[in-house]
Amino acid sequence: MDIELVVEDCGFLEGPIAMSDGSIIATEIELGRLIRVSPSGKVSVLVETGGGPNGAAIGPDGALYITNNGGSFHYQRVNGLNIPGPTPPGHKGGCIQRIDLPSGKVEKLYDSCDGRPLWGPNDLVFDKHGGFWFTDHGCTTPDGRNFGGLYYAKADGSKITRARDHMISPNGVGLSPDGKVVYMADTQTGRLWAFDVAAPGELAPPSGFMPGRVIATLPGYQFLDSLAVEAGGKVCVATIFNGGITAFDLDGSTEHFAFPDIVTTNICFGGSDMRDAWVCCSSTGKLFKCRWPRPGLKLNHNA
């Protein structure tokens, strides 16, 4: 696969969105801000959010919604790479933010659910009903781990519910083409989960002791990060250590596309045929573009 370098020297890049004008909006987690990358590769700062803006998505109102982890990682340079490390002592949790693109106004929608803090909001995806599923990655402290989970929330800030609890390290989240399945990548287990949707914002009850269905668990020591779904249903998950994108078929088989960064963190699709793919290579601060072998799934809301 031929890849093209779009931009470099970014502050731990994540949350890419392919916009209709050909630009890419992305988050710089380490720097607490969002950037816009023009088709020519020119970078401009869109808005300063503070904390650690991680995932990003366009909502039904055309606004930008952010899962902000609140600065849950301390970044450290290791052999020339920018690596997210332990949670800083002063970290109090994260939040969900709404950004009005024309004005740049930042509004906090949620920072807790049922009285419990959102420890490290990570990724989100809107359904066709206008609400969104999002993951809380949790965070690691000297006293142990604050566990995250899978949540559903309304875009107007009126309701948030916890759909699955006590997951190890929830990360990427996406929807099947028919909207009937939520996919969630768990970082530290290298596992891709599937949860059946029973009604808007509600998952089917778990079966036995398992919170959902396991699509596959990667062998060896591989972490999973953010994801995007193909139009045909494959789930493309950014893969750490075995740097690149792993495409999961629903039968559990996988196909790996290597990228030059052991901390490959995200992918998004765009272009007229949805075969343009942008991939975040975060420890080296780079964004790459390539032609994907199959079209990606068009999201429910775009701008």
What role is predicted for each listed range?
Residues 1-303:
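Sequence-structural signature of mature extracellular/luminal beta-sheet repeat domains
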